[in-house]
Amino acid sequence: MTLPAGVETVVVGAGIIGLTTALHLARAGREVVVIDKAEPWREGSAVNAGTCALQNKATDLLPAYRHGLVEWRRLVSELDDDIGFVNRGGLRVAQSAEDMAALRAGAADQAAQGVQLEWLDGNALRDRAPWLSPTVTAATFCGDDSFASPLLTGQALIRALRLAGGTVAVAGLTGQRARDDGYELTTTAGVIDCRNVVIATGAWTDRAAAMFGIDIPVLLHVNTLSVTERIGQFMDNMVVTHIAGKFTLKQFPNGSCILGGGFQGRGDKDSGKKELDLDQLQANIRYQCSVVPQLREANLLRSWVGFTAIAHDNKPTVGPMPGRPGLYFAFSTNAGFSIGPFVGRAVAGAVMGQPMPDLLRGFGPGRFAA
């Protein structure tokens, strides 16, 4: 499509954060265009595992992730569309003495942050999840752990944004020039003037920031995921994570299981090329089957890798850029799917002159200019 000559706000990046930011702006009656270098909802948000859990998140960020789950529930209601959101709780498992000690310590830390957990071992664990391997010696259950369908979520957000009057366009950002009243953006689809720019480019945040003369270091991850054929429901719609990390597992309502957790593939974000590392893929599958043996009976349909990124301090980068009126950043640093709707609402509010929520203060992009 042809870009308009000018608009109030341009959101760069059509993932979970960019689209929710734009949706809130459009529903508030603001002019907004979302641009992306490729088809919308193609990269990180589209190729992740759909996990919206608390138990596998960093303790110091738990308050923000808890609010992220609140926003997911609001999103379900506000979209009035099927996004495959399931909230049946989740298990974080331990398989060794070291795991169990870490699980107890982690549960204590999370409980101190207000997360409600139930400790399970012995018969209580077998009764709750008979499908877990006998090597799983203990688990904590969190009723807030959830998941959603990345495919359905993206489709619903794009539909809702367009219905609200927003625009989504394939247009890669290639440069910018500051103006008295905003910015002139150069893109692969032409030039567009705007008052506000929201950078919601995920793994490409460092590249976009550099166009504005800002250095935001980003560590690229190339996460491996797999999906099985549809099999009979046996996991009670729970999310499973592992105290040792690099493990997420869930069974969607259609019966297919999604295996994730962060085993690494290979890729280069500038060329866009990415590929599976077969050793890492096999390690991921063995790990999953060691926790849930029934997975061995399912055929693997497809495996893939997707880009995600982490800031050098493993903190979100969210809010207005000091000294640069009209420039905002919305970078979640890992687990963006979980916290995305919260960040989107917060950044949209900031664009409209509202203060950033207390839970996100301290994560502004100004810390990189210090």
Segment roles from a protein language model:
Residues R230-G326:
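Active-site lid/adjacent beta-loop-alpha segment flanking the redox-cofactor pocket in flavoenzymes
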Residues S290-A370:
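C-terminal catalytic lobe of FAD-dependent flavoproteins
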Residues V7-V33:
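N-terminal Rossmann-like FAD-binding beta1-loop-alpha1 element of flavoenzymes
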Residues A26-A46:
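Glycine-rich FAD pyrophosphate-binding loop
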Residues I83-R92, E118-G122, R126-A164, G265-D270, ...:
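Helix-loop-beta segment of a Rossmann-like dinucleotide-binding subdomain
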Residues R42, V191-D236:
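Central helical "cap/lid" subdomain
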Residues A49-R128, K246-T248, Y287-Q288:
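Dinucleotide-binding Rossmann-like beta1-alpha1 core, especially the glycine-rich loop
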Residues T140-R195:
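Helical element adjacent to the flavin cofactor pocket in flavoenzyme catalytic cores
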